[in-house]
């Protein structure tokens, strides 16, 4: 059996991640999908507003609503790209990486790790920083229906529900004073 691995920070889990995971489940067939959450030790900061546990809960909300099962692991940062694949593999194991990120593809391929590359349509609107900036703009909007209306273009409904039910959007208003790209 071969595991299919999807790696990301999931800050937050958005429609690009959902598309990538759906493709990973297609590739995997009866095999296992492993979701590897990077920057596991980060949380409560502008580029990484949610903790590992919160990101797991977002992903589990999406998985449950789609009747999918996956293993979720966290990976701490080491800030050492040449050694990243070896480090990450200790957490996500061997298998096939499914990615839409060219840099990640090249990093894993340079370490002879099998990769399935997925072209992501509408990538410019589904970058994590854009989704976080939208959430920042909504962080002081208290009309849940308005928040849902705006976010449905980029975030799956179960994740929107989780963010609202857990009051996990407001914190962005306390973290930054302006646009933070990246």
Residue ranges and their predicted role:
Residues 1-182:
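Nucleotidyltransferase catalytic core that binds NTPs
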């Amino acid at each position: 059996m071969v595991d299919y691995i999807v790696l990301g920070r999931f800050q937050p889990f958005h429609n690009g991640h959902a598309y990538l995971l759906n493709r990973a489940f297609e590739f995997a067939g009866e095999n296992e999908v492993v979701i590897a959450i990077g920057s596991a030790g980060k949380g409560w900061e502008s580029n990484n507003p949610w903790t590992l546990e919160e990101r797991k809960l977002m992903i589990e909300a999406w998985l449950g609503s789609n009747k999918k099962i996956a293993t979720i692991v966290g990976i701490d940062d080491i800030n050492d790209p040449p050694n990243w694949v070896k480090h990450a593999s200790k957490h996500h194991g061997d298998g096939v990486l499914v990615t839409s990120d060219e840099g990640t593809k090249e990093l894993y391929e340079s370490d002879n790790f099998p990769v399935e590359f997925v072209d992501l349509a509408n990538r410019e609107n589904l970058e994590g920083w854009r989704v976080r900036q939208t959430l920042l703009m909504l962080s002081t909007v208290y009309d849940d229906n308005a928040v849902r209306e705006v976010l449905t273009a980029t975030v799956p409904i179960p994740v929107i529900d989780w963010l609202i039910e857990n009051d996990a959007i407001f914190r962005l208003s306390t973290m930054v004073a302006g646009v933070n790209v990246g």
